[in-house]
From Swiss-Prot:
Phylogenetic lineage: Eukaryota, Fungi, Dikarya, Ascomycota, Taphrinomycotina
Protein name from the UniProt record: GPI transamidase component GAB1 homolog
Subunit organization: Forms a complex with PIG-S homolog, PIG-T homolog and GPI8.
Alphabetical list of Pfam families matching this protein: PIG-U
GO biological process, one term: attachment of GPI anchor to protein
Family according to the record: Belongs to the PIGU family.
UniProt keyword annotation of Transmembrane helix present: yes
Membrane-topology annotation of the record: Multi-pass membrane protein
Record organism: Schizosaccharomyces pombe (strain 972 / ATCC 24843)
Pathway listed: Glycolipid biosynthesis; glycosylphosphatidylinositol-anchor biosynthesis
Region (May be involved in recognition of long-chain fatty acids in GPI): 247-267
């Protein structure tokens, strides 16, 4: 990193931190705590406060039917409470959100190491960091102290240390990510492919043993802290059966609101198995391009997640520009970007009309969620198709100016 670029990055991180810190201490933070686009049943800050209140009064934080998050987040908020209360909590969350921008920069730099011929990427890492840090989908969850922002941070750390070939730190970050959100286990195999490309001497069994060691350490530490093992049941259950039907940006809540109980188990299985169906085929087909497929699967994970928020969209949409040569071959970027923005704005209006004004209903709000899912799924498919095109032309440079046609 050249000195001038270091100063620019430091200035960018400082601007992002102070902007978020200022907004976190205004009425905007209180407003965002209750916005379903930012706060979900498994990431909302108010639910953490409820769990913390139960814990401080000698009760099991998972006994109230409100707190479903990882005990790691409870420990973090409890330590912040001891150090100075809500102001320290906001400072910590803002710092973590800003540090995510640093790891985005480092990942963009490592992308060039993984792609020495610059077949996929020629974009400046600093610009990728700008896109991430100044994206409202990124800093609004940081202002709202959302747990999804911490999940994004650990996910970025996992990808970065995998791209560095540091298997012990990678396994630790992967354990942290899975402990916060068990669904993140879907990223284990594609992120392992990144590690394998950078350090071919590492075996999967070796990584898995270290991963289990760190995960066991987190479970034991949480058990001592809570004096209970209820955290092994309650948080996992809410991800598996989605019994909290609070409206969110996802597809599950409305579907299971209307579903007869006789069919609930079957469709829970369908929703759970759907993301798994894409992981192995995509990873096997493009095993030699592990970083772009990991980012694509992050987008897929946010599409089928039980309780998604705008924070889940931010990490996928902000990392895509790393592969600017792939984006140049994406045909539907304008359509998909407009669909995502349109759905987010329309969804906020429909939710306000439904809940606040009482002149709408859930059907209108869920329709905006379907538009969001359609735009996101089309963007993922467009990215994967463009990735295959760029890869094919790189291996067949003599056909560079010959357009490919679909076989009828």
């Amino acid at each position: 990193m050249i000195p001038n670029e270091k100063l620019k990055l430091l200035g960018l991180l400082s601007i992002s931190f102070f902007l978020q810190w200022y907004l976190a201490n205004t009425w905007i933070a209180e407003f965002l705590y209750r916005r379903i686009e930012v706060s979900t049943p498994v990431s909302g800050f108010l639910r953490v406060r409820e769990g913390l209140y139960l814990y401080e009064n000698g009760l099991d934080p998972y006994s109230g039917g409100v707190f479903y998050q990882s005990p790691l987040l409870l420990i973090l908020n409890y330590c912040c409470e001891l150090l100075g209360g809500i102001s320290v909590t906001r400072f910590v969350y803002t710092s973590i959100s800003t540090m995510g921008g640093l790891f985005v920069y480092l990942i963009a730099k490592q992308a060039r190491v993984l792609d020495p011929n610059q077949v996929l990427s020629t974009c400046s890492p600093l610009w990728i960091s700008v896109i991430y840090l100044l994206n409202p989908l990124t800093f609004l969850p940081g202002i709202a102290c959302s747990a999804d922002m911490i999940l994004n941070f650990t996910t970025l750390m996992t990808i970065y240390f995998a791209s560095c070939g540091s298997y012990a730190i990678y396994a630790c970050c992967m354990a942290l990510t899975v402990f916060i959100n068990p669904n993140a286990l879907l990223l284990f195999f594609p992120s392992y492919l990144i590690l394998r490309k950078c350090n071919s001497s590492i075996k999967f069994r070796q990584i898995f043993v270290v991963f289990l060691f760190y995960l066991a350490g987190l479970i034991i530490t949480s058990g001592f802290f809570l004096n209970s093992l209820s955290f092994l049941k309650i948080p996992f259950r809410v991800y598996l059966d989605s019994h909290d039907l609070t409206p969110n940006l996802g597809l599950w809540w409305y579907f299971f609101t209307e579903m007869f109980n006789e069919f609930r188990t079957f469709f829970l299985f369908v929703f759970a198995i759907l993301p798994l169906m894409f992981v192995l085929p995509v990873s096997i087909r493009l095993y030699y391009l592990p970083l772009p497929i990991t980012i694509a699967l992050i987008g897929l994970h946010s599409l089928f997640k039980a309780y998604p928020s705008i924070c889940d969209l931010s990490i996928f949409l902000s990392l895509l520009p790393i592969f600017n040569k792939v984006q140049d071959r994406m045909r539907y970027s304008l359509l998909t970007n407009n669909a995502i923005v349109f759905a987010l704005v329309l969804g906020s209006a429909f939710y306000h009309s439904w809940i606040t004004l009482g002149c709408g209903n859930a059907n209108f709000y869920y329709a905006s969620n379907l538009i969001l899912a359609l735009g996101l799924s089309l963007k993922i498919m467009d990215f994967l198709k463009a990735l295959l095109l760029v890869d094919w032309y790189a291996n067949h440079p003599q056909h560079e100016n010959i357009p490919l046609k679909q076989v009828q």
